[in-house]
Amino acid sequence: MSRLSHQDLRRGFRELIASNSCYHTASVFDPMSARIAADLGFEVGILGGSVASLQVLAAPDFALITLSEFAEQATRIGRVAQLPVIADADHGYGNALNVMRTVVELERAGIAALTIEDTLLPAQFGRKSTDLISVAEGVGKIRAALEARVDPELAIIARTNAGILPVQEIISRTQQYERAGADAICMVGIRDFEQLEQISEHLSVPLMLVTYGNPALRDDARLAELGVKIAVDGHAAYFAAIKATYDCLREQRQIFTQASDLSATELAHTYTQPEEYIVWAKEFMSVKE
């Protein structure tokens, strides 16, 4: 059986974002899930940073995973993936020079596209975790990513948080990332089509939205009209896998108490122990809630 090469998959991703349709991502977190997603007909998958942290570290999404750990998981997926996979590369694991290293490692892993976000990560001493870096630094990261890639088919996607910025600032940021050469713009936190339309009319590159299933954005035809080619609804498959594992093991142990009947969200919270990290952040980093 013929297999698609990494470059074939990257070309395939380019075709998706050049089309007139909006495609929803499958959450892929290991080789098996990548094969399942492709077999079920998904056109594109995504390895989420939060999911990688859960899968590799059993840790909450506090930017604790390292580039090496993330790239190793991406490589495992890349060995078998027969659909284009987007890597959520967070902040590029450091400054612009770290971003270059990130691109090198993820390109070798076989990733078709990667997002670099402008959130100030990891959380800084005395700063909120939602703070953003300056536009100038964000532009530098995108330019560095483009410089580092060897295969021009690898898509570099600039990501920003539209949920915490005024519309005009979102427009300004994303326009500058576009001018820096980003192949697409990813936004998280878009509220509705009105806000999306205000922003999209100022951009010419394809858009990617992290919607987390926002019901106000459930119209694929309208998303496509506004330039959205990729929609990320979340990572339900991963959380369903956690739930299935827990329920299977619970049944083996014959534990059927009401207190043990936990939802996937409750399980993730229980076993990643975020309270510990919050306490440590307050104690060692002066981070206020």
UniProtKB/Swiss-Prot annotation:
- Report the InterPro entries cross-referenced here: ICL/PEPM, Oxaloacetate_deCOase_bac, Pyrv/PenolPyrv_kinase-like_dom, Pyrv_kinase-like_dom_sf
Record's SUPFAM superfamilies? Phosphoenolpyruvate/pyruvate domain
A GO biological-process term:
oxaloacetate metabolic process
Q: Which reaction does it catalyse?
A: oxaloacetate + H(+) = pyruvate + CO2
The GO terms this record gives for MF are: magnesium ion binding; methylisocitrate lyase activity; oxaloacetate decarboxylase activity
- What EC number(s) is this enzyme filed under? 4.1.1.112
- Similarity field: Belongs to the isocitrate lyase/PEP mutase superfamily. Oxaloacetate decarboxylase family.
Q: How does it assemble?
A: Homotetramer; dimer of dimers.
Q: What is this protein called?
A: Oxaloacetate decarboxylase
Native organism: Pseudomonas fluorescens (strain ATCC BAA-477 / NRRL B-23932 / Pf-5)
